[in-house]
Amino acid sequence: GLVGSEMCIRDSKGSAFDRVTVQNVMDHASGLAFEENYVDPNSDFFLYYAPALNLGYLPGAADLQPGQTEIYGVNDFLTHFVQPDPETPPGMRFDYNSANADVLGWMVSRLMNKSLNDIIRDEVWQKIGAEHDAFIAVDRAYIPVATGGFNATARDAARYGMMIRDKGVFRGERVLPADWLEHMVDVKDSDRNAMNLNPNYSQADWIAYQDMWWILDEITEEFCAVGIHGQVIYINRSTDTVMVWFSSQRDAASTLAPEFPVKLNAARAAANYLAEQ
C-alpha cells in the first residue's frame, strides 16, 4: 500500500505533506501551493526558503537566532509555511519543488535515526570507492540540506552514476536496492500525464519524472539527475553510458534554461554514436 509522509515524520502532521505519499514526494507530484522562484527577490523562496537553507542572502537573515523567527531552519519552513494547493490533488501533476527533496531527506534521516550526511557516507559514498570526500551544506539550524546541499567531484559523481546505471551494484557489491532502480523507468500513462499537465515541460524531451529522476526514454532506460544550474548526471543503460558535466547557466532554471537542451542533445547523440563504434 501507499505510505503517507506523516507515518515517517510525525512533525509533518497538519502540514502540506500531511496528505501526500512518499511516492508523491519522490515524483515531485505533491500538489504544493508554493512556487519555486530563484530570481524574484519578492518570492517566498527568496524571502523565506533560501535564508532558512543558508543558500541565499537576505540582509540580517544569517544573524537571526532560534525564537526570533517562525521559520528558522528548513524543517520549520516545510511544516509551518508550505501549503497544499486545493486545486491540485497529490499525484496529479509534476511540479519540481525543492521542498520535496528536503522532506524526503528528513524522512530518510528519521527512519534510519542518523543524520543525512552519515547515511550518505556509510550507505553510498564509502561503497563506490570515491576518490574524494564529498560535503553537504547545512541549513540555519545546522541540519544537512537535501536539496542543493550535496557537493562532489565530477569523477565521483560519475562513480555514483555507474552504480545507478548498474541497478545499484558497484564492482560486484550491492549498494542500493534494485527494485527502486528498476521502478523509476517503469513509466505509466499516469506518469506521462503528470508531466504533460505542467505547461513548462509539455514540449520538452522528458516523458516523466519518477523516483527523483528525469526520464527521457523508458525503453532504452535513459534518464538524468539535474541541478538548477544545469549540472547533470546522464545515464543510458542501453548504451552502457554515464556522463557527468558541471555547469553555470546564466539563470538558475534547471532544465528550462534555453541553453540546457543543446547540452543534453549533444550528450544523447554522443552516447548513441559511441555505442555504434
Can you name each region flagged by the protein language model?
Residues 32-33, 101, 142-144, 164, ...:
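Solvent-exposed loop/turn segments at secondary-structure junctions
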Residues 1-4, 8-9:
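Single conserved hydrophobic/aromatic residue that forms the stacking wall/gate
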Residues 120-186:
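Active-site-proximal binding-pocket segments
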Residues 222-277:
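Structured C-terminal helix/loop/strand segments within mature extracytoplasmic catalytic/sensor domains
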Residues 131-135, 185-242:
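Active-site Gly/Thr loop motif
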Residues 13-128, 154-168:
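Active-site-adjacent helix/loop patches that line small-molecule binding or acyl-intermediate pockets
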Residues 24-27, 95, 132-136, 149-151, ...:
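Structural recognition of the beta-strand scaffold that forms the well-ordered cores
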Residues 47, 138-152, 199, 203, ...:
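Carbohydrate-binding/catalytic loop surfaces
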